[in-house]
């Protein structure tokens, strides 16, 4: 209850860099909307970030790797 969250969207490397940045933002917005629907207070969401394909956690050379790169991350910051 004492945390703020920034929602960070990521993609794999398929598609152009511009497309992937927009896709990662849409992904973050979609998760934000779902969290609000589930009752998270809007003031808890302090930001949305679109990282596109820039920060892969796995290789984009395999389907499994691409699947891992299509993700959302939550950055939590404790409220004072």
Q: Which functions belong to the PLM regions below?
A:
Residues 2-4:
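A general structural motif
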Residues 10-80:
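Periplasmic OmpA-like peptidoglycan-binding domain that tethers envelope proteins to the cell wall
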